[in-house]
Structure formats: C-alpha cells, structure tokens
C-alpha cells in the first residue's frame, strides 16, 4: 500500500519534472532531486528513506518497533518542495554570514536557527557541504589545524533560517565547550533545534555522551544524525542503528525519537534531513 502510494507520487513528480525540464537553481554537485526521482524504486528508497530501507532487513523477532519510529515521514512532494529552500537563487540567497568565538560576537538574528555539533572527524563539514550542494558559492570553512581557533560559523539560508556549524569537539573539548558551545546552547534565544552528529561506524562515544548530557541538561530539543552510513555493511549498520535507537528511547528525554542516518558520499538521507530542517524552521509555509 505504502509502496503503491510512493510510486503514484513518484510517477506524478516525474510528470512534473519532465514537464518543466531541469529544476530551477539545481546544480550538478548533488544528484538533483528530479534525478533521484528517476532512480529505480529500490535505489530511490535507499537514497531518500534510508530507515525504511533498513527496516526491510529487520527479522520479525528483533525487538519490533525499535526503528519504526517514523514520526517524520514526508511525501516525495514535500521533500521536493524542501529542496527549493536549499537552492540558491537571486531571491533565495544562501551565504556565509560570519564567524564568532563568543556568543556576544554572534550575529543578532530573529529568524529561526539550527546548529550542528559533533566530535571532530564525525563528518560535520561534509554533511553541511552536502546540505549546501545547491548553493555552490557557499564555502564551508574548516579550521582543523591544531592550535587554530575554532569558531562558530553562521550561514544564512534565504529568509528562512540560519545554520550554525559549531566547532568540532575533540580531546580538548571541555575548554571549547565551556567557552563557546555550552554558552551558545544555553543562551541562544532563536535556536530551534540542535543536530548532534554521531559516527554510525563508531557509535556513541564518551565525547558524544558529554554533548548528549549537555543537551539534556539544558532541555534542548535535539536530533541525532548518524553519519557515514555508506561505510558499513547493512548488517553492521542495522546493529548500530538498533543500539543507538534503544539508547535514545531509554536514556534521553529531549532527543527526537527518530534517527536520521545519512551519507555525505551517496547523499542517502540528505534530502529527508533537508525536508526536516525546512519543516521545523517553518520554511515550507
Ligand atoms: P568533520 O571534522 O566533522 O567536519 O569531518 P569531515 O566532514 O571533515 O569528515 C571527516 C572524514 O570523514 C573525511 O575524510 C571525510 O571525507 C569522511 N567522511 C565524511 N562524511 C562521510 C560519509 O558520509 N561517508 C564516508 N565514507 N566518509 C565520510
């Protein structure tokens, strides 16, 4: 039934895509959504709905319902509409705004804000680049040199929202956090959602736990993104997803119960994440 609906919608969108030619503002660095819609059904499901794809491989007695928390399950039309929020055009300027080392240096903005946090090397820059792949002029700045000051980088996404790339936390995390990340998370008034990146190959580390505890302590609404899902076999990924899902279900209060598995290499899950961000920031009105 769901598959039929999916195919009905896909067929409809394909008609729309072919009627209008290439989608406006879509650049070649990411598979434009119209191209994704032309993929065979199995591949399309893997790219657009990675959790659904994983669910296919659940054996019936393996803790039913554990990854069935699909609270956010938009149609292909909705995902297609959200793409335009992330496509840079003259009327929808997507640009780097500024960097800050302290919250009082951060731009004062009214529009909703989302931030991305995660330990160094988790794949944060790669994900942000993937989100901005239809805004080729945006440079995602990376400052990885040891001793180089790490900053919060602010990006404006049209009139919709700002996206903040927070410094990655490493073994020197506590200092960075107290000075910057913690204050930002605690005091940023327009912060709508925090996206916490966890490496799906590694699982939740001690450093991730510090960030989770912080989000919990400040009662922030946050969302867990599982990165690099292209790196593991389906079996290993499923095991990791089930473990992390169980952790979220039993150990957290503020974490959105649905995980977002993504790959910045295959773009799997990236379109769905864009749609979620567009939705929670009210960009789809
Ligand atoms: P950051 O330190 O969190 O910003 O991490 P980066 O985005 O720089 O990524 C760290 C390393 O992981 C780089 O070598 C990336 O090429 C690699 N990487 C990032 N995302 C992915 C992914 O989705 N799949 C794979 N296979 N590698 C990734």
Swiss-Prot record:
SUPFAM superfamilies recorded:
P-loop containing nucleoside triphosphate hydrolases
The UniProt annotation places Mg(2+) binding at 125, 149
Q: Which CDD domains match?
A: YihA_EngB
**Molecular functions (GO terms):** GTP binding; metal ion binding
Sequence ranges assigned to domain EngB-type G in this UniProt record: 110-283
Q: Which cofactor does it need?
A: Mg(2+)
Per UniProt, which keywords does this protein have? GTP-binding, Magnesium, Metal-binding, Nucleotide-binding
The record lists GTP as bound by 118-125, 147-151, 165-168, 227-230, 262-264
Q: In its keyword annotation, does this UniProt entry include Cytoplasm?
A: no
Q: Does the keyword Coiled coil apply?
A: no
- What cellular component terms from Gene Ontology apply here? mitochondrion
Designated name of the protein: GTP-binding protein 8
Per UniProt, what is the name of the gene that codes for the protein in this document? Gtpbp8
């Amino acid at each position: 039934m769901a598959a039929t609906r999916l195919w009905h919608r896909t067929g409809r969108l394909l008609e729309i895509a072919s009627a209008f030619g290439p989608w406006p503002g879509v650049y070649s660095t990411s598979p434009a959504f119209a191209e994704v819609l032309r993929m065979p059904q199995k591949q399309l499901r893997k790219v657009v709905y990675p959790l659904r794809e994983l669910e296919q491989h659940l054996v019936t007695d393996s803790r039913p319902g554990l990854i069935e928390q699909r609270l956010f399950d938009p149609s292909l039309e909705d995902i297609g509409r959200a793409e335009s929020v992330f496509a840079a055009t003259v009327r929808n300027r997507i640009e780097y705004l500024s960097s800050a080392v302290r919250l009082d240096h951060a731009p004062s903005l009214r529009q909703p804000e989302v931030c991305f946090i995660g330990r160094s090397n988790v794949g944060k820059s790669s994900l942000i680049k993937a989100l901005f792949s239809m805004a080729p002029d945006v440079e995602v700045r990376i400052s990885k040199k040891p001793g180089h000051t790490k900053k919060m980088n602010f990006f404006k996404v049209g009139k919709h929202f700002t996206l903040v790339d927070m410094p990655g936390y490493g073994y020197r995390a506590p200092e960075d956090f107290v000075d910057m990340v913690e204050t930002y998370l605690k005091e940023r008034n327009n912060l709508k959602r925090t996206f916490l990146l966890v490496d799906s190959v590694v699982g939740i580390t001690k450093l991730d736990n510090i960030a989770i505890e912080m989000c919990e302590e400040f009662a922030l609404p946050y969302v867990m993104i599982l990165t690099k899902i292209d790196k593991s076999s389906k079996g290993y990924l499923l095991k990791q997803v089930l473990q992390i899902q169980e952790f979220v279900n039993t150990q957290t209060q503020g974490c959105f119960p649905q995980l977002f598995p993504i790959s910045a290499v295959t773009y799997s899950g990236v379109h769905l994440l864009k749609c979620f961000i567009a939705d929670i920031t009210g960009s789809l009105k």
